[in-house]
Amino acid sequence: MKLTTEQTRKTWAIALYACILLVMRAGIARSGIAASLAGQLRPALLSFGLLLAPLWFFGFGLGEWLGRKLRSPWSRAAFPALLGVPYLVFAIPAGNVRWSTTVVVFLLPVVLSAVVESSASKRKMVWQDVVVLGALFGVYLLRLLMPDWPHAGLAVLPKLYVAGLALYLYVVIRKFDGVGYSLVPKRDAFLSGLREWVYFLPLGIGLGAALGFIHFHASVPFTASLLSGVLTTFLLVAVPEEMFFRGILQNLLETRLGQNTALVLAALLFGLAHFNTGASFNWRYVILATIAGIFYGRAWRARRQVLASSITHTAVDVVWWLWF
């Protein structure tokens, strides 16, 4: 039987997902994370795999498929409670189940889904969007879920939880136009992403050096380390952040404020999201991240592709990691 394009895409998505998990497992084994987790390595990897799954498979059409299958408001509101399962997968073997946390990680998706459901037919940003995005932004920015995965090496898991929930709310329930969340490789996405990276690079290096934020250092990592770093940056940093700040936030803001104002405001909020990185208020990082956000937003806006802005974001972060 000849496979259709959709079936081939699903097969590749599953195969690549398995490869990603193997690469991540190998990278963790070489790092100090494995030692710090001790006997909790397997539950941590399983929890990570479950939280990564929505971010990955929504990029290959899972969100649209769920939108067709979950027809009743009740089923759409109840389904995302499954996002709480990865917490139990990690906490139960560790004997560290916190019932207050369990209630939050299972109930928060249901409550926010119900709020979004009431605005699903609206094609512009409404007060429900402000409530939902504010809640998601607050949960992540204030690191409210960090104690639930209490290891430094697992800091990305709360981000994946929030990202998966945001995707579900705006792709499955809200079905908002123009999010552009697809991980299927496209030539124009790569060209748009690399173009904005080239535009930002001299400005970012010049301003970063002037502010004393970056300092040049030569670094040539092993090929395996470089590939692992690029993959990690793309999947765990660029994609979730670009999906939220560009595909959802900037997209919604455009419906009320117009393209240019939305671009600047989304970039400013993106910059402010980095205020607690390192210093108590890292104003240098906020300035540079805000300016970078302008170029990320331009990359997304060119063809409404999260992949494009994720490529720009990844390229910026990898250059910073390698040489600054």
Regions found by a protein language model. Name each.
Residues 239, 260-324:
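Functionally important transmembrane alpha-helices
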Residues 130, 190-198, 227-231, 260-265, ...:
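Hydrophobic alpha-helical transmembrane segments
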Residues 24-35, 61-64, 86-96, 118, ...:
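Juxtamembrane "helix-exit" motif on the non-cytosolic side of transmembrane helices
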Residues 39-49, 73-173:
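Alpha-helical transmembrane segments in multi-pass membrane proteins
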Residues 8-26, 49-54, 74-87, 131-138, ...:
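Alpha-helical transmembrane segments
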Residues 62-75, 116-127, 151, 180-188, ...:
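Membrane-interface helix-boundary motifs at transmembrane edges
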Residues 141-237:
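Juxtamembrane helix-loop-helix connectors linking adjacent transmembrane helices
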Residues 182-192, 240-265, 301-305:
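Membrane-interface helix/loop boundary segments of multi-pass membrane proteins
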